[in-house]
A protein has these predicted regions:
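Structural detector of well-ordered beta-strand residues that form the stable sheet scaffold
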Residues: 51, 76, 97, 149-151, ...
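Conserved SAM-binding loop
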Residues: 59, 81, 345
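Conserved active-site segment immediately N-terminal to the catalytic lysine
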Residues: 152-186, 215-222, 270
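N-terminal "arm"/small-domain region of PLP-dependent enzymes with the aminotransferase-like
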Residues: 1-26, 346
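Active-site PLP attachment segment
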Residues: 169-211, 232
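Phosphate-binding glycine-rich loop
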Residues: 27-74, 88-92, 98-100, 165
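PLP-dependent aminotransferase class I/II
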Residues: 33-39, 44-50, 111, 115, ...
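PLP-dependent aminotransferase-like
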Residues: 65-154, 161
């Protein structure tokens, strides 16, 4: 593709950090960059605990396991989600309960959450989709009233805030992704974050093959655990990226605004919108085509390919997949509607104005 969908921003800073990690990061120094990354990211988020993991999926799996979620439990999440959000629920033997999204935020609808709660509900997962921020105040109030944990999937929300508080830091715990497509990257990677001391300690134990930090005997686990730890070399990339985080988030926001400005005059196209009191980290610009145009990603696929533009579809509702749901939940009207009419636009950090103009002009020519 001439204009790729996404790619990371890697400079000599990252290269130097990695070279150092490879040179000296062994033996009793094997976790130096990992420890530094956790501390630096905690400082950035203004949160007490960060546990760096091999993926956001792993971080979510650890967190849900630490909450004690298992067979017979229900976890409420939005039908519009990437599969990584639902997979840990299934692996733990719990039942995912899929509800509709808010048409303005594209995130889980608190009204639908309230309607879906039963005596088996153990958690609500709020995914901050594409950098948009969920209605956390309402969700946390619901969680408190029903004694249900509210979890934040902030995989796509680095730089996103509500009332100047970072997405991922408001619920019982949050998770982040540092995949190569994300705003900051470690190649592959994720993080579990929380202000809950006990939960953080349990997650660290689970993430170390069930071995507690307080156990004096070597190779002596106290429970069956996991191994989702991020490598020191990956963490070195992350440490370098964190020195540039304001630059990287700011560039993503510039790109979203460039698309917004370029498409503003087209009455049939709308973009990601910031809700009141929120700041979007702008991970992924999405254009939504008016219903009256009867077009979406499927209808424009060949046009994009011919122009060398690597655009992508909006996330399909999870209830489409038989391993998640017995049948599509068509009552989740907004999830199914936006899926058909929305398109992810190229937004890598080094995209040029000319490349964005190519995408903008293509949309204007096809949607009119």
């Amino acid at each position: 593709m001439k204009i790729p969908y996404t790619k990371p921003s890697i400079t000599k800073i990252e290269q130097d950090f990695v070279e150092n990690a490879i040179s000296v990061g062994w033996g009793d120094r094997c976790y130096e960059y990992l420890t530094r990354f956790e501390q630096d990211f905690a400082r950035h988020l203004q949160i007490k605990h960060v546990v760096a993991t091999s993926s956001c999926t792993g971080a979510l799996h650890l967190g849900l396991a630490a909450l004690g979620i298992g067979v017979g439990d229900e976890v409420i999440l939005a039908d519009t989600n990437w599969v990584a959000t639902v997979s840990p629920i299934i692996h733990l033997g719990a039942q995912p309960v899929l509800v509709d999204i808010d048409p303005e935020t594209w995130c889980i609808d608190p009204i639908k959450v309230e309607e879906a709660i039963t005596n088996r509900t153990k958690a609500i997962i709020a995914t901050h989709l594409y950098g948009n921020v969920a209605k956390m105040d309402e969700l946390i109030e619901i969680g408190l009233r029903h004694n249900v944990a509210v979890v934040e999937d902030a995989a796509e929300a680095i730089g996103s805030k509500l009332n100047n508080q970072h997405a991922g830091t408001m619920g019982s715990f949050g998770t982040f992704s540092f995949h190569g497509s994300k705003t900051i990257t470690t190649g592959e990677g994720g993080a579990f974050v929380t202000n809950d001391d006990s939960l953080a300690e349990l997650v660290r134990t689970l993430n170390n093959h069930g071995r507690s930090a307080t156990e004096s005997r070597q190779f002596w686990p106290e429970r069956a655990g996991f191994k989702y730890r991020m490598s020191n070399v990956q963490a070195a990339i992350g440490c370098a990226q964190l020195t540039r985080i304001d630059e990287l988030v700011g560039r993503k926001q510039e790109i979203l605004n460039e698309y917004r400005n370029g498409l503003a005059e087209n009455q049939y196209l709308t973009m990601n919108q910031d809700s009141p009191f929120t700041t979007s980290g702008a991970w992924m610009p999405n254009v939504v085509i008016s219903k009256c145009r009867n077009k979406g990603f499927d209808e424009l696929t060949d046009v994009f390919k011919k122009a060398g533009v690597d655009a992508r579809p909006f996330f399909a509702p999870l209830s489409n997949f038989p391993f998640v749901s017995k049948e599509p939940k068509l009552q989740n009207i907004n999830s199914f509607d936006l899926w058909k009419r929305s398109i992810n636009l190229p937004s890598f950090h080094d995209i040029t104005k000319d490349e964005m103009s190519t995408v903008i002009n293509l949309l204007h020519s096809e949607i009119k």
